[in-house]
Curated annotation (Swiss-Prot):
Induction (UniProt): By activin. Weakly by bFGF.
SMART domains, alphabetized: PAX
Protein name: Paired box protein Pax-2-A
Regions recorded as binding DNA: 16-142
GO CC term, one of those recorded: nucleus
Region (RED subdomain): 94-142
Biased composition (Low complexity): 166-178
Length: 497
């Protein structure tokens, strides 16, 4: 093509180029384009050639053409500028000598005064005059020579005689910097505090066994240990320090038996902890109050005395000043067991303190309990009950272990009667209608040994589901007219949400 056959003025002027651009033209890094190429770019622009065509014809990058044309349209100049580059050096040797001369004549002369004098005497013009910061830098680096103190303490800076600056205060001489390299880095050496000869001699004696600055670290530790041992510590403290020094920095997580002291092992052994546990148990049993039932959040176990009566006892619970309803589970309140319970009670020696015991219930109550007695530690809902549907989950609202149920009803004033007496339930006390539990048949008979017979049902409907807890009252559920013949206790014990 004819583009490549044309002579390139830039190539002719700069045979030793630094690189080739994308258009095939050569250039030199860090150098502006020659004036010939700049003039040619301006001429082609006056002829109406587009910048992209100028870039192709002259093999100059499009950015360079645009920059040159933009500066030409703004300033009318095609000379390269200093935009983004370094300024020309204004601190020429002539200017530096003049600044030094002004400073010798008047050492208290300011930099701006030197700048004004350079302009007034015509040494520099507005374009070449150095700035105030440049003048200060010239004075600091070239006029003021570095300060070299002499051994006698009178500092004399090296420089041209007659115009050197003497500092106001002479620096103190550094003493014994070469004789005592270790002491110069100590606190006394840094602060310049002289040490006594006895201290130096003791340090030399302690360090004479191979603990120099280039010695082994283990020997330095031994020398430090000897130094501390001779001055401050007793024999017991030294033994404790030796044990600490020999201990590894990062001990294992699982310590072995030899790392534990004998007194600690005896202190935290199981026989030593057993009396403490007994005291805690006794204090817990003695500190029971009426608020225990409301604070119980899950199944808990209480100690049970082994001595018990084999005969069935009828015990009437009489709380002092509180009702059993706030701290009794819903299953007890709904089944009529909150007031009077027939159970096999375990008696303690001191009857004045509140006691908690497990009980065994033998009377079937309206399908709530089966013919089997409750076993301590077993859930009520885990037993097979005759009238419950098979799809009810084993855990429900009334799922409490027997020990928890026994502990929720504190036996404060327990009166034991060996004679058989008729039992009254909540329904009998609060309503004049016949009791569904058959607790009083005719003239004060006992509980009926036969289970309550009722037709089994397999499905629930919305009529049996109650979400309002205000409906859980004894007269409502144990009334024959309000619920009919179906057992409401079974439905409410497992369907209350």
């Amino acid at each position: 093509m004819d583009m490549h056959c044309k002579a390139d003025p830039f190539s002719a002027m700069h045979p030793g180029h630094g690189g080739v651009n994308q258009l095939g033209g050569v250039f030199v890094n860090g150098r502006p384009l020659p004036d010939v190429v700049r003039q040619r770019i301006v001429e082609l622009a006056h002829q109406g050639v587009r910048p992209c065509d100028i870039s192709r014809q002259l093999r100059v990058s499009h950015g360079c053409v645009s920059k040159i044309l933009g500066r030409y349209y703004e300033t009318g100049s095609i000379k390269p500028g200093v935009i983004g580059g370094s300024k020309p050096k204004v601190a020429t040797p002539k200017v530096v000598d003049k600044i030094a001369e002004y400073k010798r004549q008047n050492p208290t002369m300011f930099a701006w005064e030197i700048r004004d004098r350079l302009l007034a005497e015509g040494i520099c013009d507005n374009d070449t005059v150095p700035s105030v910061s440049s003048i200060n830098r010239i004075i600091r680096t070239k006029v003021q020579q570095p300060f070299h103190p002499t051994p006698d303490g009178s500092g004399t800076p090296v420089g041209t005689p007659g115009h050197t600056l003497v500092p106001s205060t002479a620096s103190p001489p550094v003493s014994s910097a070469s004789n005592d390299p270790v002491g110069s880095y100590s606190i006394n050496g840094i602060l310049g505090i002289p040490r006594s000869n006895g201290e130096k001699r003791k340090r030399d004696e302690d360090g004479s066994d191979g603990s120099g600055p280039n010695g082994d670290s283990q020997s330095s530790v031994e020398s430090l240990r000897k130094h501390l041992r001779a001055d401050n510590f007793t024999q017991q403290q030294l033994e404790a320090l030796d044990r600490v020094f020999e201990r590894p920095s990062y001990p294992d997580v699982f310590q072995t038996a030899e790392h534990i002291k004998s007194e600690q092992a005896s202190e935290y052994s199981l026989p030593a902890l057993t009396p403490g546990l007994d005291e805690v148990k006794s204090s817990l049993s003695a500190s029971g109050n009426a608020d225990l039932g409301s604070n119980v959040s899950g199944p808990q176990s209480y100690p049970v005395v082994t001595e018990s009566f084999a005969s069935h006892l009828y015990v009437k619970q009489e709380p002092h000043e509180a009702s059993l309803t706030p701290f009794t589970p819903s299953s007890l309140a709904s089944s009529g067991l909150a007031d009077i319970q027939p159970f096999q009670m375990a008696l303690t020696v001191d009857a004045s303190t509140p006691t908690y015991s497990s009980f065994t219930h033998h009377g079937p109550h309206y399908g709530q309990f089966g013919s089997q007695p409750l076993i301590a530690g077993r859930d009520m809902s885990s037993t097979t009950l005759p009238g419950y549907p098979p799809h009810v989950p084993p855990t429900g609202q009334g799922s409490y272990p027997t020990s928890t149920l026994a502990g929720m009803v504190p036996g404060t004033n327990v009166s034991v009667h060996h004679s058989v007496q008729p039992v009254e339930c909540c329904s009998c006390l609060s309503s004049s209608k016949p009791c569904l539990f058959h607790c009083r048949t005719g003239s004060g008979s006992e509980f009926s040994g036969n289970p309550y017979s009722h037709p089994q049902y397999t499905t629930y409907n919305e009529a049996w589901r109650f979400s309002n807890p205000a409906l859980l009252s004894s007269p409502y559920y144990y009334s024959a007219t309000s619920r009919g013949s179906a057992p409401p206790t079974a439905a409410t014990a497992y369907d209350r949400h």
